[in-house]
Amino acid sequence: MSISHIFGPQQPQYSSVTASAHGKVNLHLGVGPAREDGYHELDTIFQAVSLKEEVTVALRDARGAQDAEAVQVAEAAQEAADAAPCTWSVSGFDSHLVPQDSSNLAWKAVAAIQKLARQAHVPWADAPVHIHIDKGIPVAGGMAGGSADAAAALVAATELYFPDSRASRRPDGAQLSDIAAELGADVPFCLLGGTARGTGKGENLMPVIATGTYHWAIATDKRGLSTPEVFKQLDQQRAAASAASPKAARAGSPEGLIAALRTGNPEEVGKLLVNDLQAPAISLLPSLRETLKAAEEAGAIAAIVSGSGPTVAMLCASADDAVEVATAVSVAGKASSTMTTSSPAAAAGVIKREEVLE
């Protein structure tokens, strides 16, 4: 039976939708003291990079037989999230490291949109779905790969369940941003893309004007770092350094960086890259110091631990320079893998729709 005969008079317009969302680098990451809820106050400048994730959400009856590697989400998790039956599969960079359980942010994002679709009486809201993630961003590397999965899944699921952009029940940008913030602190920026200043946990965003294109060499480390552990190490380092309360943002104000971004001059931007989490990340993974040194020796304008690490982002003068720096760091044995990318990049968006066949 074709999918067009399953749902009665109101049929889905699409059998599957694919969306993409980009990773990020933190050009400035100032970390304040821990809050009562356990999070830290942040003052950060995000910039989206060309590395991206692609997420496809498909109505499973439209997809036919499932891939042999497809993983079934546990029924208990589906019931707890009030979600439709779901399978998923993963391909691409570090695909074997992607969590294949209910902690997966892409699945949580789809479940959130399914809930809205159910409230709006969308007939296919409870239909089984398949989620496929094609990864292009390092896993657990401080570049928001999981958050990009969630952002892309939000966009794809919204288009699948609410194909009419004029429909009153379709979640708008503000509502998607609210859902994104519930999923994770970096997810709202992965929806927005471009360049933005983030405060609070990073979810309160203000777009920043940036001109020019910035070229990066990226060095990954397969050992990974736990974000909570890096923040814990920062707190311990600060407590050991001073009995006084830590300042709200040890990296200082990002206003100088914001001004430099308007010029489009990578040399000026490079002078102002700063990350309060770099020292604790190096403390937990001392080899990062050698990676940063190798980047400098290879001719990078500047190098910085990306977010909570362990990925190192190396700002370069040109795309050719980025290739040379990435190659040099790799040959020196100071990274598990290297790649190049550029910034800024666009917002999350739909890249493919498959119409339902009659």
UniProtKB/Swiss-Prot annotation:
The active site is at K24, D186. GO terms for biological process: isopentenyl diphosphate biosynthetic process, methylerythritol 4-phosphate pathway; terpenoid biosynthetic process. Pathway: Isoprenoid biosynthesis; isopentenyl diphosphate biosynthesis via DXP pathway; isopentenyl diphosphate from 1-deoxy-D-xylulose 5-phosphate: step 3/6. It catalyses: 4-CDP-2-C-methyl-D-erythritol + ATP = 4-CDP-2-C-methyl-D-erythritol 2-phosphate + ADP + H(+). Its EC number is 2.7.1.148. Keywords: ATP-binding, Isoprene biosynthesis, Kinase, Nucleotide-binding, Transferase. InterPro entries: GHMP_kinase_C_dom, GHMP_kinase_C_sf, GHMP_kinase_N_dom, IspE, Ribosomal_Su5_D2-typ_SF, Ribsml_uS5_D2-typ_fold_subgr. Transmembrane segments: none annotated. It comes from the Bacteria. One of its GO terms (molecular function) is ATP binding. Belongs to the GHMP kinase family. IspE subfamily. Catalyzes the phosphorylation of the position 2 hydroxy group of 4-diphosphocytidyl-2C-methyl-D-erythritol. This is 4-diphosphocytidyl-2-C-methyl-D-erythritol kinase. It comes from Corynebacterium jeikeium (strain K411).
